[in-house]
Amino acid sequence: MGWKEAAAPVLTRMPAVERPEGHVPFRRKMYWTGGVLVLYFFLTNVPLWGIQTAGNDFFGQFRSLLAGGQGTVLQLGIGPIVTASIVLQLLGGANLLGLDTDNDPRDQAIYQGLQKFLVGVMVVLTGAPMVFLGNFLQPSQQLAQSMPGGAFGVEVLIFAQIAAGGILLLFMDEVISKWGVGSGIGLFIVAGVSQSLVGGLVFWEGGVGSQGLLPTWFDIIVGNVSNMPPLLSGSGIEFLLMQAGILGLLTTLFIYVVVVYAESVRVEIPLSHARVKGARGRFPVKLIYASVLPMILVRALQANIQFLGQILNSTLASMPTWLGVYGGNGQVTGGLFYYLAPIYSPNAWMWWTSGATAARWQVLIRIAIDLSFMIIGGAIFAIFWVETADMGPDATARQIQNSGMQIPGFRKNQGVIEKVMERYIPQVTVIGGALVGLLAVMANMLGTIGNVSGTGLLLTISITYKLYEEIAEEQMMEMHPMMREMFGGGD
């Protein structure tokens, strides 16, 4: 008996959100999407009951990307979902699952059940060390005195809350995927990054360097900034670029323009209908063919590596210096985990500034590792993404063949169409994945409004762009119901 036969009775009965029986009207989809987003914002502001303080956010640079809230019910964010996706993509890429998710409905149900099971496992593997080992969430000593089991009982209560939040986020994503518009994970990332961007623009407390861009410039204009250097001097230019937020603003605008332009760059393969004379179309192969979503997987892998370092630092009595050196604030400052940590702000690599602590050679090695990790990892995960999302040459050729279309000048044969697609899709996938990885590192190094991670900004712009396209498509199907069949919208 294989693993499928043994696991099928359990995996096919995993809880799931029921699929709609027919076409869901656009307005109802927007209601579902808006309702889930309101619930998401509510949960990111519900503090965990039983913690002493939220503590230092050791994963602040990944917070917007993982769409979580420090010290809240959504402490884990989409981390377990993304990590489970990484495991599934690696297993599927190595052909170890033996599942035909394209043609066999039973294998599809097993795959979806396996995904939910792995998410549950990752919730435990991520949440348990965070509560019981890492001291990231300190239990309230006052509550521990009146709680059965003392501090351990409070820790169990905290773990139950973040585990429930992680599982609830999985089903919220499923609700949007089946009943709403877009992807739940994508919308949660957009929501988290948008909060940071708005705060980076209008936050009015904390003084220059820690408040928003608009209040900072208001203080500069009215002369409300103490010890401000002459603006035309070297220190004044550094002040304008770094503390006044000019560099972050320019980087944000630059990334926005590049991503929107890259989304519009495409190779269009002409198509014609085999039976309907004059019916023509084009199949677009975009420069960012795999989208920027594979970057979530790359950054999540980096986040898990840093999480392992934090766990080792808090549990080992004396951590080897070659492995990692951690400061009083919990941030890594040396060792292997330092070089594997992503660059997430200008201060992390500008060794000539006053706040720099690392030597030039250390910074250069770290930049080289981060660039290599993101560019190579972006290309590899883009390939995995294309294959698992049925966007590869074989799946695309099959979809074109089944739609009755063909490439003019070629025989109406799936193998012929596949060979034409192989000229473009694999190469564009690798180039697009590497380009997105490079842009993510550049955005992190130069800084953005609200200190949003470069990957989070890339994802937000790209997801918003695709969401706009999806909404336009949905409205077209509402206006012309006959278009649903062409887009696969059902009855």
Curated annotation (Swiss-Prot):
The keyword Chaperone does not apply. The keyword Cell membrane applies. InterPro entries: SecY, SecY/SEC61-alpha, SecY_CS, SecY_dom_sf, Translocon_Sec61/SecY_plug_dom. It is a multi-pass membrane protein. Keywords: Cell membrane, Membrane, Protein transport, Translocation, Transmembrane, Transmembrane helix, Transport. Signal peptide: none annotated. GO terms for molecular function: protein transmembrane transporter activity; signal sequence binding. Residues 48-58, 135-152, 203-244, 314-365, 448-452 are extracellular. Residues 1-20, 88-109, 178-183, 267-291, 386-428, 468-491 are cytoplasmic. Residues 59-66, 67-78, 79-87 dip into the membrane without crossing it. It is found in: Cell membrane. GO terms for biological process: SRP-dependent cotranslational protein targeting to membrane, translocation. The chain crosses the membrane at residues 21-47, 59-87, 110-134, 153-177, 184-202, 245-266, 292-313, 366-385, 429-447, 453-467. GO terms for cellular component: plasma membrane. Component of the Sec protein translocase complex. Heterotrimer consisting of alpha (SecY), beta (SecG) and gamma (SecE) subunits. The heterotrimers can form oligomers, although 1 heterotrimer is thought to be able to translocate proteins. Interacts with the ribosome. May interact with SecDF, and other proteins may be involved. Belongs to the SecY/SEC61-alpha family. The central subunit of the protein translocation channel SecYEG. Consists of two halves formed by TMs 1-5 and 6-10. These two domains form a lateral gate at the front which open onto the bilayer between TMs 2 and 7, and are clamped together by SecE at the back. The channel is closed by both a pore ring composed of hydrophobic SecY resides and a short helix (helix 2A) on the extracellular side of the membrane which forms a plug. The plug probably moves laterally to allow the channel to open. The ring and the pore may move independently. PANTHER family: SECY/SEC61-ALPHA FAMILY MEMBER. HAMAP family: SecY. This is Protein translocase subunit SecY. The lineage of its organism: Archaea, Methanobacteriati, Methanobacteriota, Stenosarchaea group, Halobacteria.
